[in-house]
């Protein structure tokens, strides 16, 4: 199979990158006002037998208070993947609101067996009209 002429005409972008070369590490979670526990299932695993990133995000969202989930939509997500999780690991999803309006939360996912932090994240929520 030959590469088509359209692809051959493509040129790399020059100048500044869209994303910075290095991303800042999010702060740790000092206070845990909302928590939920999960056990890693087979359906949470990718082909390498690690928990996939979709499961991590689902667990973070599940730790957000129901009153926020019922009245808002996830508008922004910033996430740092720090370590891997595996089948049958017990994971604690914890979060704490950054502001009094509950529009932003800091999150942490921790493997309970050894206390290893797996993920840090920040979510921003927008009220449903």
Task: List the model feature ranges, each with a label.
Residues 74-76, 120:
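Hydrophobic residues on conserved beta-strands that form the core of alpha/beta folds
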Residues 48, 73, 83-85, 101:
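Short amphipathic alpha-helical interaction segments
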Residues 62, 76, 80-87, 92:
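Extended serine/threonine-enriched, polar tracts that run as long, contiguous segments within proteins
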Residues 1-24, 28-30, 85-87, 97-129:
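HotDog/MaoC-like acyl-thioester-processing domains
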């Amino acid at each position: 199979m030959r590469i088509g002429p359209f692809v051959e005409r493509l040129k790399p972008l020059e100048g500044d990158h869209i994303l910075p070369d290095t991303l800042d590490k999010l702060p740790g979670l000092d206070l845990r006002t909302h928590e939920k526990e999960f056990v890693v299932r087979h359906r949470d695993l990718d082909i390498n037998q690690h928990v996939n990133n979709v499961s991590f995000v689902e667990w973070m969202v599940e730790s957000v208070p129901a009153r926020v989930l019922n009245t808002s939509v996830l508008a922004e997500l910033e996430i740092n993947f720090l370590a891997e999780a595996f089948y049958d690991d017990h994971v604690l999803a914890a979060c704490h609101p950054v502001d009094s309006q509950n529009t932003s939360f800091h999150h942490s996912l921790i493997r309970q067996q050894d206390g290893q932090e797996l993920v840090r994240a920040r979510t921003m929520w927008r009220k449903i009209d």
